[in-house]
A protein has these predicted regions:
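Polytopic transmembrane helical bundles with strong interfacial aromatic enrichment
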Residues: 1-148
């Protein structure tokens, strides 16, 4: 069972990173009806992957692996968890923007977004990607038993 949860954890993490990379690519292009639809769908996949990653990850902490006591005394784990929460909170900004496009997309229109909002969404996605790189570093440190 431990192996299955490790597999699910990695699957969710890779799905989350892939979805965010797709968002990063799409948001840098000219916004079209097709790209707006893709962003809405990709952001939904991103949200589902993030929720599943949190559930599977916490299940591993509390029911499998080394136990909650070990993890909650690990600075690398606490940093990783904190950054995951920060990324989750940051992701609300692009998600709210993308969701505001639903009406236009349903009407087969390209959503209107001003340059300032687009820069903000792009900057947030950059920040999320940077935080995920640090999360991966923390995961590698944890795997080696470091920074306890």
């Amino acid at each position: 069972m431990t192996t299955m949860f490790a597999f699910l954890h990695h699957l969710c993490a890779f799905t989350l990173v892939s979805a965010l990379a797709i968002e990063f690519t799409l948001i840098r292009q000219e916004l079209t009806l097709a790209s707006a639809r893709r962003l809405l769908m990709t952001d939904m996949v991103y949200g589902i992957a993030a929720g599943a990653l949190l559930v599977v990850g916490l299940s591993r902490v509390f029911f499998f692996e080394k136990g909650a006591e070990y993890y909650f005394h690990s600075h690398a784990f606490l940093t990783k968890l904190s950054l995951f929460i920060v990324v989750g909170l940051l992701s609300i900004i692009p998600t709210m923007e993308f969701l505001s496009w639903r009406g236009a997309v349903r009407a087969s229109q390209v959503p209107a977004i001003d340059a300032k909002k687009m820069r903000r969404v792009t900057a947030v996605i950059h920040g999320e990607l940077f935080a995920i790189v640090i999360i991966l570093l923390c995961a590698a440190i944890m795997a080696r038993g470091g920074w306890v």
